[in-house]
Swiss-Prot record:
Family in the record: Belongs to the UPF0758 family.
Annotated motif JAMM motif, positions: 178-191
Protein known as: UPF0758 protein BH3032
List of residues binding Zn(2+): 178, 180, 191
Length: 232
């Protein structure tokens, strides 16, 4: 195999990911095989399956791959800009489909429901994201919105921004949440102050703050369960 890059055609028929997908379904493929299909070709010294494994190792499996940028992908030998753009677009499409499926029917009744809804999306974030879930009278998620990115501070997270969307969506209630990039969801004094302030405004305008959930790495804390919601 002199100067030609190695493609999926160089893999024995029965082992080709595309053929396996056709005959066994996408669910039967390994992460490496799915990445290989997306890459299509390897390099003159590395098969496409080897390149796929190289990509997964570079990003610690799927853990960091979901946040991969074009710049990060093109830093890997064998991945050009066009291939990196297609890769990022496929990741974003999968993320959007997942979000739509979740929100179509997702009902929140407990802090565990909140955690299941956002954990995989939020536990890897490198900055604090303050997010609101707006619910209808059946506790179904109407809308999810990131209100603020950065260190949480009672003077920065303004109730106006939180409740403006609640009024626009005719929400019956809302749940606030944010992540701690450290992975430790223990609430800070600022977290508690923000919760009290939003609960007071919600009581005044008739849109109840049901909870404020802090997301860590595979763990979470409900400020309602900790007794920090003054009107619950």
């Amino acid at each position: 195999m002199s100067n030609m890059s190695m493609t999926l055609r160089d893999v024995p028929n029965r082992e080709r990911p595309r053929e396996r997908l056709l005959h066994e379904g996408a669910h039967a493929l390994s992460n490496q095989e799915i990445v290989a299909i997306m890459l299509r070709t390897g390099t003159k010294n590395e098969s496409v399956l080897q390149l796929a494994q190289h990509v997964l190792c570079h990003f610690d499996g799927l853990r960091l791959l979901r946040e991969a940028t074009v710049e990060e992908l093109t830093s890997i030998h064998g991945i050009g800009e066009a291939k990196a753009i297609e890769f990022c677009a496929a990741i974003e499409l999968g993320r959007r489909i997942h979000t739509m499926q979740e929100m179509d029917r997702y009902v929140i009744r407990t802090p565990e429901d909140v955690s299941r809804f956002v954990m995989e999306e939020m536990r890897f974030l490198s900055q604090e994201n303050f997010v609101c879930l707006y619910l209808n009278t059946k506790n179904q998620v109407l809308h999810k919105q990131t209100v603020f990115i950065g260190s949480l501070n009672a003077s920065i997270v303004h109730p106006r921004e939180v409740f403006k969307e609640a009024l626009r969506r005719s929400a019956a209630s809302l749940i606030c949440l944010h992540n701690h990039p450290s992975g430790d969801p223990t609430p800070s004094r600022e977290d508690i102050e923000v919760t009290h302030r939003l609960a007071q405004v919600g009581k005044l305008i008739g849109i109840e703050l049901l909870d404020h959930v802090i997301i860590g790495d595979r763990t979470f804390v409900s400020l309602k369960e900790k007794g920090h919601l003054p009107f619950s």
